[in-house]
Structure formats: structure tokens, C-alpha cells
Swiss-Prot record:
It comes from Schizosaccharomyces pombe (strain 972 / ATCC 24843). This is Nucleoporin nup60. Functions as a component of the nuclear pore complex (NPC). NPC components, collectively referred to as nucleoporins (NUPs), can play the role of both NPC structural components and of docking or interaction partners for transiently associated nuclear transport factors. Active directional transport is assured by both, a Phe-Gly (FG) repeat affinity gradient for these transport factors across the NPC and a transport cofactor concentration gradient across the nuclear envelope. Its main location: nucleus. It is a peripheral membrane protein. The modification Phosphoserine is found at S157, S159, S161, S162. One of its GO terms (biological process) is mRNA export from nucleus in response to heat stress. Keywords: Membrane, mRNA transport, Nuclear pore complex, Nucleus, Phosphoprotein, Protein transport, Translocation, Transport. It comes from the Eukaryota. Residues 1-46, 178-210, 295-321, 338-519, 565-614, 647-701 are annotated as: Disordered. GO terms for cellular component: mitotic nuclear bridge midzone; mitotic nuclear bridge midzone membrane domain; nuclear membrane; nuclear pore; nuclear pore nuclear basket. The keyword Phosphoprotein applies. Component of the nuclear pore complex (NPC). NPC constitutes the exclusive means of nucleocytoplasmic transport. NPCs allow the passive diffusion of ions and small molecules and the active, nuclear transport receptor-mediated bidirectional transport of macromolecules such as proteins, RNAs, ribonucleoparticles (RNPs), and ribosomal subunits across the nuclear envelope. GO terms for molecular function: structural constituent of nuclear pore.
């Protein structure tokens, strides 16, 4: 069994000194001897050495040292023979590793080419190579291969650490036959150097081509370099050995600080496609504390290249420990709960915060269960209180007016009239300047019955006072008697603070006074019909406000009215009597109503503070009536009266109100149309501050005067006595 190439022995002294088992060295002229080539060791010893790595290292050291070139010509010395004997034993073992005809042929060729190798390629720089290439190329155009070769040379020249590996340096390293053949083929191509020569250096430019697969199995022994984590994807360094497919698959080595990687399990793939349909992965216990934890980092699908790493790991945010995180969460929950409790202390249902239900030992990526969260949510959401629908009784009260009076209240008013007489007596001292006594004609035996109807007030333009709408209805009387001329005044007093449903407005409408000798033209209507009037009342001046508050009911929101009548002395002129003496006023708080009367005695004169202005118009049939008796201070013209008239009432004092108002009265005919309108004005003398007299019109109405409490001027009334029916409505403000 031959273990090496056939060698010819040199005839001489050296050949005689060798034993038959020594390695035969080659002669100087290259001829080989035909002696025996018995191996010095047995087969078992050589097999044992072949399996041990120590023999490999010895063979590498032999091939790396220049043995052949140094001792090829020195065969005469004894030291050379001993050296060759030692080498022969080593090469005999190594020859078992390379025991193929291809390797034997390759070794012979390698010796021939190594002697002929020149260092011209090694010494040339990229600039020299390009200069030589373009000097040979001249003006001929470049093809695609030449362009790529030039670009690769320029890229090498740009990187300072890139250099061409010399063939001499490759001889000093141990190479397998296949690797040596590859390096021989690469060294033969000088015009197109491969970019792989600089693949071990990390300073390549991004323009270099990618020449590796997605997951190369190359191994990089440089563990101490931390630049591998920040390498750009376009670099030519070998792939970093990290576990991309979980801890089950083995890799050449694993880093101690691991990152969670995407897994190819169906659950992980479903997370990447639809993260909301699955649970988030839990944080690993072995994960380092200096790596930031992000829930969205597990839902990213990895790319084909393993070098695409997130650059956020360069400056990781240090997360606190679990004990510190639990303390911070407890403090944060207390701070969030404190303002919500203080703000909602009065409310019975205070929404608890979500932080109070989270465990302080919970991990950052783990939330509460859906079932528990659904139980918390209804308590945190406070339902708005539903608006209570008003009942039918409330809507009826709102739709109807507050100032609605029924005839059933009138007997109660008559029964309790005497109890409120003391209230009118207390006001006598305040109205002494307006006291005045006149004789009233005795009224007819009719009981005054009033009914009030209050439709909704409609005012087009706002005004400082407020006006109210009232209708007074009374049953018709069977018999009517024309009454003589009676000087009576009719006025309304409104309180300073009126109910919200009522409104009063001021209309100053001055009308010329009629002549004293003018007769009264009255239209009468069929029996049972009422008289409709539109009333607007306004308060004017501080005195009016003072008098209005006196007659205002304490707790009732109903409007307060005061009816006054001025009676004259029988068959006597009262031209100089302008002072009115106030008397007791009978009022009823339940109805907000007050009646009064006053007499005007002769010889007394006093300046009234204010008078009421009324303008009345009636539409009735026109029977002729005797002319009214005209007094100097009171003038009545065209006053429409109903078919029911009253006899002159007894003398009884009443209180005079101070207000300025305008009354317009309209009465429709039986056919439903207004046939005729007549204005009736009654003027009263009014003294200003200098003593001058001013006339203001007043309407004249006949009505029944109630008796006083002390029994003076009492008039007996029966339950069958009736009063005329009046209807009042709101009059819109007129602007002159």
C-alpha cells in the first residue's frame, strides 16, 4: 500500500545510510529511486493519529513552513537527512487525509505554479489597476462586465480597510483542496476582482451587491464586537446568529440578552394578521430589565432578511422593577381617585375609577379580563336622570290662567267682608289728603255677582308694565230701570309686583273734552248680552307704586283690583270740591278684590295726586236717554250702559286709587258685527305742583257699594240682587 508519490533515490552516500523503512527523498535532478516504500508505522497507529486533532495541527505547521525550498538542495549534511526523516514520518500520516488522485495531481501543480507566481497583482493598487485597464482599453466602449468590474474596484478603493489578499499569504495558511482550487480560480481573474475579498471587514459601502442568502450558515467568531447589532441591511457581513424561530431550533451560538422574536406558530401568525382577535403574549421571565416592553412589538411580521432590526434597541428605556411599578400604580390610583371623590361627594352614585380594579402586580402588557371589565363599566357610566313627564293636572294648571275666578267665591267674599274692614282703616291716615264725601244714590235691590275669566295674555310689543286680561260676567236682570245722572268713577289698581301670567302697559291717549251740555247717546242691546272691554293698566310714579303695594294680597298671585265710586251731593253743585276723604276699604284677599266709596262734601278742596284715564267705546242699540248731569270737575259723555240700571246708592265712603290707565270697550251686536263705536271720556280736574288744573277723562260706571264695618250707611242686600255683566280684554299698545 503506497501512501505517497513515487520518488527516485539519489545514488550516493545518503542512500546507503538509510534504512529500508526510511522515507525516500527526491534527488536533486528530479529523478526518483525505485527502492521500497515501507511505512514506518503500522496501520492502527496511523489510523489513531489520523483521528486525533493533534496530528492535524502538526500537518498544518509542516505545510505552512517552507520546507521544500529550504532543504531541497542540501542532501549531503547529516542534519538535513535527519530533518527529512522527521518530515517523512509526518507527511506519511497526512497523506492518509489526502489520498485521492485529484489531490496528488493538485499538489504537483501547486508546486509548479507557486514558484512562478509574481507579486505584481498584489502590489498594484485599485488606481493602478484602473490606469492600466484604461490605457489598454483606449477609446473603445465598455461592456456591462467591464462596467461592473470598474465599479467594484472603485468600491474597494473607497473602503480604507479593504485590500487584496496576496497569494504568498495564502500559501502560509492551511487550505483544503477545494478551497485552494477556488482561490486559484479567483486569483486568475485580475480585471474583475470579487467583492468577497473584503467581506470580513465591516466598512463596506451600501452600493456593494448582496451576495448571500436570507439565512446563511456562515459563522463569525468575532463575539466581542458590538457593532453587529447596528449593522445596516446592505452590509456584507455574515448573518448574526440569533434565534428567529424560537428556542427549539439550535444555532451556532446565542446571545445572552435575547429579544422576543416572532414565532411561526399558528397563534403567532394569527396575532400578526388580526391582533385584536387573540391575546397578547406575556413578558418572558428571563427577559432583561433594560429592554423596553411594547405590546405592538409582537404583532410585526418579520421580513426575509434577519438583519432588519429595530433601531430603537440602541437606547432602551429602563423600566422600573415590579416593586417600584406596583408602588407607582398605587400612588397614581390614589391621585386619580381623590379629585373624583371630592367632586362627586354630594352625588349618591360615584363612579369608581378603573385603576382601583387593576392589580398592582399585573404585568404591563396584561389587561383585566373582559368579563370583569364589563361588570365595572355600567357602574362607571352614570345614567342621566330621565325628565319626569308632567301629569295631566299640572298641564291643566299651566294651560289655565292663575287669575280664574268663579261665582262660587262671591258669597264667601260677602261673608268675610267685615273681617277685613280693619285693614282699610289702617290706610285712612295715609289717604287723608284725598278724603272727600258725596251722596250716593241708593242702589237697586240686586246682589253683585262677578265672574272672572282669564284667557292667555298676548302682547305684541314688550313694555315696562304688564297687562292682564279679565272678563266679568253676571246673569242678566229681568227688569231694568234708567238711573239718574250719577257721578261715579271706576278705576283699576295693579300691584307693583304682578303675577307672571298678567301684564300691564301704559297708553297715554288724550281725547278732547266734550261740551257740558252734550247729551248721552247710549246703545242698548238685548237682555242677557254682555259688554266687552279691552283694558290695559299701567303703574306710574312712586305714589302709584305705594298705593298698589297696599292693596296687594300677601300670598295670592291673583291680580288685585279696586273699584271706587265718587257720589255727588243730592241736587248740589260740587265745582269747588276736589278733595277726597279716604274711608274704609273692604278687600278680600282670596279674590284680590277691593271696593270702596267716597263722598265729596262741598267746601273742601284738595289736590289729588293722580287720576285714572279711561276711554270706553260701546256698540249697542241707540235708545234716547236723558242728558247726564254734569259737574264742573266730572264730565261724562257717551257712556254706554246695559239695559240694567241702578238707583242711586246711599252715601258711603270709598278709597280712591291713583293710577293712569286706558280702557277701550267694545260691545258686539246681536248679528256679530260692530255696528257703532262711541268713545266716552270722563275728565277729572288734576292740580299740578303750581296749582294749575289739568283735565283727564274718566269713564262712568254704575255699581253697588258694599256696606262699611261700623254700620254707617248700611244698605240691605238680598241674594237676588244682580249687577251688570262686564267683559275685559287686553288692548294692544298704540303709539302716536
Amino acid at each position: 500500500m503506497s501512501s505517497g508519490p513515487i520518488r527516485t533515490l539519489h545514488k550516493g552516500k545518503a542512500a546507503r545510510n538509510r534504512t529500508p523503512y526510511d522515507r525516500i527523498a527526491a534527488s536533486k535532478d528530479g529523478n526518483h529511486s525505485n527502492g521500497p516504500q515501507t511505512p514506518s508505522k503500522s496501520i492502527f497507529q496511523r489510523a489513531k493519529e489520523w483521528l486525533t486533532p493533534s496530528s492535524w495541527k502538526k500537518a498544518i505547521s509542516i505545510f505552512s513552513s517552507p520546507v521544500v525550498n529550504k532543504h531541497e538542495d542540501s542532501f549531503d549534511s547529516k542534519t538535513d537527512e535527519e530533518y527529512l526523516q522527521n518530515v517523512s514520518t509526518t507527511t506519511e500520516d497526512v497523506s492518509m487525509l489526502i489520498n485521492t488522485p485529484v489531490t496528488e495531481k493538485y499538489e504537483q501543480e501547486h508546486r509548479d505554479t507557486s514558484a512562478q507566481a509574481t507579486p505584481s497583482i498584489v502590489e498594484q493598487s485599485p488606481n493602478q489597476m484602473l490606469a492600466n485597464f484604461f490605457s489598454k482599453k483606449g477609446k473603445t466602449p465598455l461592456n456591462e462586465i467591464e462596467k461592473e468590474g470598474i465599479i467594484s474596484i472603485l468600491n474597494k478603493s473607497a473602503s480604507p480597510s479593504s485590500s487584496v489578499i496576496s497569494p504568498a499569504a495564502s500559501l502560509n495558511r492551511f487550505q483544503t483542496p477545494r478551497a485552494a482550487a477556488i482561490s486559484k480560480r479567483e486569483s486568475g481573474v485580475s480585471s474583475e476582482p470579487r467583492a468577497r475579498t473584503s467581506s470580513l471587514t465591516p466598512g463596506n459601502t451600501p452600493n456593494s451587491a448582496k451576495q448571500w442568502s436570507a439565512f446563511r450558515s456562515t459563522f463569525s467568531p468575532l463575539r466581542e464586537q458590538d457593532q453587529l447589532s447596528t449593522i445596516s441591511p446592505n452590509s456584507l457581513l455574515p448573518a448574526q446568529r440569533l434565534s428567529y424561530y424560537g428556542p427549539t431550533l439550535s444555532t451556532p451560538y446565542n446571545r445572552r440578552l435575547r429579544h422576543k422574536r416572532h414565532s411561526t406558530t399558528p397563534i403567532s401568525l394569527s396575532n400578526s394578521i388580526a391582533p385584536s382577535l387573540s391575546f397578547q403574549p406575556k413578558k418572558a421571565r428571563y427577559e432583561s430589565a433594560n429592554v423596553s416592553f411594547n405590546d405592538t412589538s409582537f404583532t410585526n411580521v418579520p421580513t426575509s432578511s434577519p438583519l432588519h432590526q429595530s433601531t430603537t434597541a440602541n437606547h432602551p428605556e429602563k423600566t422600573p422593577s415590579r416593586a417600584a411599578a406596583s408602588l407607582l400604580s398605587i400612588l397614581d390610583s390614589k391621585e386619580k381617585n381623590t379629585p373624583s371623590i371630592t367632586a362627586k361627594a354630594g352625588s349618591p352614585q360615584s363612579a369608581p375609577s378603573k385603576a382601583s380594579y387593576i392589580s398592582p402586580y399585573a404585568r404591563p402588557g396584561i389587561t383585566t379580563s373582559r368579563r370583569r371589565h364589563d361588570q365595572i363599566r355600567p357602574s362607571s357610566e352614570k345614567s342621566e336622570p330621565e325628565k319626569k313627564e308632567p301629569s295631566a293636572f299640572e298641564t291643566l294648571e299651566k294651560s289655565s290662567n292663575v287669575q280664574t275666578y268663579k261665582p262660587s267665591l262671591m258669597p264667601e267674599f260677602l261673608e268675610k267682608a267685615s273681617t277685613h274692614g280693619s285693614f282699610a282703616k289702617q290706610k285712612e291716615g295715609e289717604q287723608t289728603s284725598l278724603s272727600e264725601k258725596t251722596a250716593l244714590s241708593e242702589p237697586e235691590n240686586k246682589t253683585p255677582v262677578f265672574s272672572f275669566k282669564a284667557p292667555s295674555a298676548t302682547t305684541d310689543k314688550p313694555s315696562p308694565p304688564v297687562s292682564s286680561i279679565f272678563s266679568f260676567n253676571a246673569p242678566s236682570a229681568a227688569s231694568t230701570k234708567p238711573s239718574p245722572a250719577v257721578s261715579s268713577t271706576f278705576s283699576f289698581n295693579a300691584p307693583t309686583t304682578t303675577p307672571s301670567a298678567t301684564s300691564f302697559s301704559i297708553i297715554n291717549k288724550e281725547k278732547p273734552a266734550r261740551s257740558p251740555n252734550e247729551t248721552i247717546d247710549v246703545d242698548l242691546e238685548e237682555e242677557g248680552s254682555g259688554i266687552s272691554a279691552e283694558v290695559e293698566v299701567a303703574n306710574e310714579g312712586e305714589d302709584l307704586q305705594k298705593n298698589a303695594t297696599e292693596v296687594k294680597a300677601s300670598t295670592s298671585e291673583k291680580p288685585v283690583f279696586r273699584f271706587e265710586a265718587v257720589t255727588d251731593e243730592k241736587n248740589s253743585e260740587v265745582s269747588s270740591s276736589n278733595q277726597a276723604s279716604s274711608s274704609t276699604m273692604i278687600s278680600q284677599p282670596n279674590t284680590g278684590f277691593s271696593f270702596g266709596s267716597f263722598n265729596k262734601p262741598a267746601g273742601q278742596e284738595e289736590k289729588p295726586q293722580q287720576r285714572s284715564l279711561f276711554s270706553a267705546s260701546f256698540t249697542t242699540q241707540k235708545p234716547e236717554l236723558p242728558a247726564a248731569k254734569i259737574e264742573p270737575e266730572v264730565q261724562m259723555t257717551n257712556v254706554a250702559i246695559d239695559q240694567r240700571s241702578f238707583e242711586q246708592a246711599e252715601k258711603s265712603p270709598i278709597s280712591v286709587s291713583e293710577s293712569t290707565s286706558l280702557v277701550e270697550v267694545e260691545k258686539p251686536s246681536a248679528e256679530g258685527t260692530n255696528e257703532h263705536k262711541q268713545d266716552a271720556t270722563m275728565t277729572l280736574e288734576k292740580t299740578d305742583k303750581q296749582g294749575s288744573l289739568e283735565e283727564e277723562p274718566f269713564p262712568k260706571f254704575s255699581f253697588t257699594v258694599l256696606p262699611k264695618e261700623n254700620g254707617e250707611n248700611l244698605s240691605t242686600m238680598e241674594s237676588t240682587q244682580e249687577l251688570p255683566k262686564f267683559s275685559f280684554s287686553v288692548l294692544k299698545e298704540e303709539k302716536n
